Amino acid sequence: MKIEDSYGRLLTQSQMTNDLKEIAQELPAIEKQNGRYQCFRCGSLIDQKLWKLSEEVLYCRACIQLGRIRSDQKLYAIAQQNFEGQELLNWKGTLTSYQQEVSDGLIQAVKAGKHALVHAVTGAGKTEMMYQVVATAIKAGKAVCIATPRIDVCIELYGRMKKDFSCPISLLHGESEPYFRTPLVIATTHQLLKFYQAFDLLIIDEVDAFPYVDNPILYKAAQNAIKKEGNTLYLTATSTDELDKKVKKKEIIRYSLPRRFHGKPLVVPEIKWVPKIREKIEKGRIPYELLQLIKKQRKTHYPLLIFVSEIELGQQFTEDLKKYFPKETVVFVSSQTTDRLRMVEEFRNRAITMLVSTTILERGVTFPFVDVFVLESNHKLFTKSTLVQISGRVGRSKERPTGKLLFLSDGITREMKKAIKEIKEMNQEAGF
């Protein structure tokens, strides 16, 4: 590793060289706080009975995948340095007046040293609204990171930023190439655990998504990764209670955009009664009501994305679909699918016509012209936030700002009602 690649990084003792020790700040690996021991890197409280190597030496089990932290060793931080400022924005598109208002507000918030929340509907163009504030920071020689909880979203975002920004960009996730220092970093939120006071601007996209939401370890990671005088921007289509509280306390500024970039309303889900979905699928059959809905949709020749709650159900349903629709190309994807990215791209290009997915594709991916069905939308896994995100896959393209969006179930849950209510309220706020 080059010395400059360690700037802004949080390193364990085993990662240190003599050259690095000369410029590093020593930090306690495990601190004692009010009689309890706490990991400096991830903030976890240490179980003194179980998390120990000997009677005298404790370690942190919570973040051990990043390298073991021991109470008898130190952590080391190498101070971040400014970059050489540069013009770097290649994007030739234009923002709508609504998007421009948010973009300008974010630039002013950063100049004023404020943190901000962008609460914008799915398909509002949140990424494009970030371009100017990112470009402004990098032009001033600042270090910027865009972090998101999901690898799929991270990789798709990296591809877009590579196309629209000319500066070097590093991509960081569990399966990525080794890190090298760049003015712009695209990373999963877990990768923030490897940084310390590294970024002048930290943008956390999909802040409501698992595994970031309600995860104190990842909150600590974000807190450590930002410089003391740095700014954090949060992006979401479904805000969290914690962020709403911060807005009320005026700890962060809120910018809301209830209108999609193409100016059309959000597609509101329809609820369709389909009894015994799971029972029939597990027997190798597709419920009659569901079969008729799929047949009707396939006559349109638009791609069909079907969400399921569990991997086993998705696998069985995909096999059932192949039997009933032998002329269609049907594929199932989940977190366990090794070539998921290729399949997603083939679905986008219509080489795959019907895609069955777990909630791994609930957010961060765009499929023009797509229709969406949610099987067992009354399943406990389908929370309001998840259903709003899934609904946001429909109607995202200017060429087809509408689409078929069905919640298929044999009951209506509070989460389903709340999701539909929120979508209708956003449309109302946008003037529809």
Residues covered by each model-derived region:
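Interdomain "pre-motor" coupling segment immediately N-terminal to P-loop NTPase/helicase cores
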Residues: 28-82
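Conserved RecA-like helicase motor core of SF1/SF2 enzymes
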Residues: 206-209, 344, 348-401, 409-414
